[in-house]
Amino acid sequence: MKNLISKNENYCIYSVGKEYLYDIVKFVVDENYKHHSKFETVNNINEEIKTIYEEELSFAETSQIYIAEDSFQRMIGCIRVYKWDKKVLLPIHKIFNINPLNYIKETKNSSFWHIGRFAVSSNVEISTIRLFKKLMMYAIFPIYQEKEGYMIAEIDSKLLQIINRLGMDTVCLKSGECYLGSETIPVYADKEGLSKFYHSYISEILLDNINQCYIKAA
């Protein structure tokens, strides 16, 4: 599956199926180590790609996955949002040994969404911040439609600073750990915490085909 969501003169954004997951995971891992570490061996990186790919397959049935491609059909960005069933172990369990449900006041209306595999290429001559905002908006869109939607994520510490400056109010659950070559922090945000970011940048995706994609994935 590959459905066009948005198109401009620099790139196209698609909603894609699980057949793209391996390429997405490889892109994310490669970009992370390109930014943060030059000391990992090829074997170590390949093993991480394999492990993360298998993890992503376990999320695929209730995930919405987005990729951005340039005019040469090269991946330049991606993100995945997963509606969590509270049974499958998330990265936050495995990396930090914590259960986010111990920190969130759950009600019968609560729904939980894990955002991950978020990366934008460092080798593009476009406004990466605009692509960054669009991809993040696609990910939080279904969360914000819920009565009591919660975002759960593990975010690079520098990226988290940018997200917070852009208006997202996140709650840190634990101090950072090294993951994929950088300090990574476990966070969550409720609907109120997402509100400022959502309303500031909803105009970025108003003309996109996001509603159709959301309805299909619900």
PLM feature segments, named:
Residues A60-S63, I76, K108-S110:
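Short connector loops at helix/strand junctions that flank enzyme active sites
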Residues I67, Q73-K83:
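Conserved beta-strand in the GNAT
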